[in-house]
Amino acid sequence: MFLGRLPDHLILFPTRAPIEAGGAVRKTVSFENGELEIWTAQSQRALQQGGADIFILRFYGNADRADRWAALEAEMWSDHSIEIWGVNYPGFGGSTGPARLVRIGPAAVAAFDELKRHAGGRPIVAYGASIGATAALHVAAQRPVGGLILHNPPPLREMILRQFGWWNLWLLAGPVALQIPPDLDSIGNARASRAPAIFLLADKDEIVAPRFHRLVVDAYGGEKRLIALRGAYHNDPIHGAALADLNDALGWLLKENLRQRR
């Protein structure tokens, strides 16, 4: 029993304490006899025109929360009319627990399905950072997303086996890797995904080494554009020239999406 839950304890660090959400608006979605908490916020351009042209379904890291970032991130998309839907995983913030890896994939799909009902045909871009990239890739493999943004994507099984297996002769790493849910298989989901994708890759990532990013990039089955985050570590925010590149790349992503739909 303990070994079966070991990946949850090693990877997920949920918090429940209230966080100031700025101007973000809280909503909930029914999920597995409980609720999934989502925080929404619009960019200035979306507010000015009375609605968004693009929706960004946002998934965060293994110790992070949507209520911390949704409003702040909406402000950074100054060139686009967007609405952020930031998802708190089960067990995080106001989302019903428990926090389990096996619940992340289904929760991500439930959030997408709710957003799709709201979006009215407008494009939905799934954006995930760190473990959030595994959720975004799962959605892209299961649903018709308009595009993907993947920030330091981790191939969890491969990391456990290759980075931690040697010191225990794979006696612990092997069983732990097998406990990673198939929904969060970044390599398999990358191969199955066809939406245009933007990869944001920190070249000094100390948590998900760049060689592991590359496994996901190389497996990805759709059109892709890479943005190198030079000198950046795993949790460094996107800013400066990289933020300008991301805004430009979103325009490319949307054009690719339109081309594929013709």
Task: List each model region and its residues.
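Short alpha-helix in the alpha/beta-hydrolase fold that links the catalytic acid
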Residues: 72, 185-186, 195, 209-218
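Hydrolase active-site cap/lid region
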Residues: 138-189, 195, 238-239
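An N-terminal hydrophobic leader/cap segment in hydrolases
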Residues: 1-31, 35-44
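Acidic catalytic loop of the alpha/beta-hydrolase fold
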Residues: 203-208, 235-236
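C-terminal catalytic histidine-bearing segment of alpha/beta-hydrolase fold enzymes
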Residues: 214-262
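Membrane-embedded segments
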Residues: 36-114, 122, 134
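Short beta-strand/loop motif that positions the catalytic acidic residue
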Residues: 192-194, 198-201, 205
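Alpha/beta-hydrolase fold nucleophile elbow
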Residues: 119-130
